[in-house]
Every structure is written in structure tokens, then in C-alpha cells.
């Protein structure tokens, strides 16, 4: 059963009058949520709220989501249904973000980083980065408790084209080479596609993990080269 079929089933479980935000409560109530379904719905739902925030609700949303997910033509309707439900839902994006953070729990920080990374991919899909999108993503990061270097790293990578290598590895610029190496090894493990899938990243979005792994390795190469100079 494809993830898009499972998402359709999750949406169908909503009772009449319930908004899409109730999906997150339903998944959380199951004890161990189907994390890949939850992740996918979360990215599309927050992506829809972000599109509404900048007023560009028709700016090629399917094409934008393809920067994160592999979406077969036959499953575009399922992705579009989630997008439209979120766009029409009266609940604010902050209510979504709070429910999403609660759903993944305290151990879900890496999933939330993946999610924010995906939203940056969507925000920059049209070649522009609007002030409203910037404010939106900053607020989501605050709700997710992804402060400081983590947020700066993602923003710099997607908007400026290059992130500070110390931010990428979650380090202060004064960190020793030994600490940088340890942080790099830890980040490589966390960014491995198999580990990412185990924590909830759907295989359809594996390019996020691959992109993150490249960024982590590039950061270590940059730091080690600077120290060797």
C-alpha cells in the first residue's frame, strides 16, 4: 500500500466537520503513529499554510512538493486533497505546528529538522523567498524548538546558497577539531537514509536525508581544511 493510499485513509477517518488538524490528534492517539504518514501530512499541511501566508496559493504546489516527495501522477490527487484541506482549515499554522511537535514527542527533534528542511525546499521552489515565508518558517522553528544555529543553517543553505559549517554541525566557531570530528560523526549517523527512514522520513522523501548528508560532509571538509591551513 503506497503512502498516498495510507494518507487517503487517514483523511477519510475524519468525522464530518473536523479540520485536518484532527488528523494529528488521531495519529497520536494510536500510541505509535505511522510516522511516515504523519511526516508527509505535516509537510503538505504546513506547506499549504505557508503558501496561504505569502498569498501564492496556486504557485505550482505539486511541483513544489516534488522537491521533497516522489509523487506518481496517479497519487497527485491525494497530495492535493491534503493541501486543499489545510488551506481551507480555519486553524492557524501555529496550531498545526504545536500538534505536530506533540505528535513526534521529545525524541522527534531530528524528524522536525527534516520537516523544516522540507518546508525550506518548498518555500524556495519558485526561485524566490518571500518575507512572509521567512517569518512563517522562523515561527515554525520556534515552536519546534529549533533555535539558533539549526535554523540559521537551514536558511543559509536554501536562501544564501551556503551555510556556516559550524552551524551545520551544531557547534560554536571556537570548537576544537576533536569536537568538530565527533559532531560530524554523530551527524553522519543521524543523516544516514536508513536511520532517517526509521525515525519517520518516508522513502518518498529520501532525497532530504541524502541532501542533509552531503551538507554534513561538506561542513566537516570545510572545517578540517580551515584548521589544516
Language-model region placement:
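Small-residue-enriched hydrophobic alpha-helices in membranes
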Residues: 1-49, 56-229
